[in-house]
């Protein structure tokens, strides 16, 4: 398990261009191009919910679920099998499993290569 440098960075912007692009503080960026599992936090009487999203084909009705700009990344790890786990303040959680044929996710940082 490998902890990533994006912990404690805030989400500046979330976009959909060639996948789900999460722009973070300090010129860091996560690009997800394979299906992800997004855990939504509980709200009011509604419990937490898991939603599978294909970042290359996000329907209009799922786009509001990706509205967590401003949230701080509280936990960022890569499991030994290549699974990316991201937790955000406010309760959102993203899990991206590896794909044998394509890069499922990429992490870029101006100061990290």
Regions found by a protein language model. Give the residues of each.
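Surface-exposed, interaction-prone regions used to assemble/regulate multi-protein complexes
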Residues: 1-113
């Amino acid at each position: 398990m490998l902890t990533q440098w994006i912990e404690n960075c805030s989400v500046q912007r979330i976009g959909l261009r060639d996948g789900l692009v999460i722009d973070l503080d300090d010129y860091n960026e996560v690009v997800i191009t394979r299906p992800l599992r997004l855990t939504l936090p509980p709200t009011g009487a509604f419990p937490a919910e898991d939603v599978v999203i294909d970042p290359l084909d996000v329907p209009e009705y799922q786009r509001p679920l990706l509205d967590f700009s401003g949230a701080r990344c509280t936990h960022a790890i890569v499991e030994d099998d290549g699974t990316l786990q991201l937790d955000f303040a406010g309760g959102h959680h993203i899990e991206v499993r590896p794909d044998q044929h394509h890069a499922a996710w990429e992490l870029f940082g101006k100061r990290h290569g």
